Amino acid sequence: MNRRRLLQGFLGASAMLTVAPALAQTEAPAISKPPEDKPFAEHFVALQLSDSDPKKERLVLSVASNLLKAYGADKVAIEVVAFGPGIDLLRETNEFRSLVDSLVTQGVRFDVCGNTLDTIERETGKRPAIN
């Protein structure tokens, strides 16, 4: 009986000695810095587009536009990430090209998935022209 209590006490103390330093070393989550082009941004939004459906393209552009209106261009950092068939939004020939250009002038960033570009280039032998 005494051995059991001694063993339980030893295991409990060992656990505390192991866990306590780990708890003491955990840091508070890092607060991300605003993008350099939006130093006063208070809101950060990422929108994704993975379809070349015009309805979805218009919806993403509309959401970005509404966010700019709601928060103001200097208070919100918006990034639209296109991958897969969604990269069609950023082609010169896309019907919404003028809307994309307008959002870019208001500070919205548009990024294209590099893996998508690499895959298209590998399959077709030509890298798509994205602006």
Each PLM stretch: what is its role?
Residues 5-25:
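N-terminal export signals
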Residues 8, 25-131:
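Secreted/extracellular ectodomain signature
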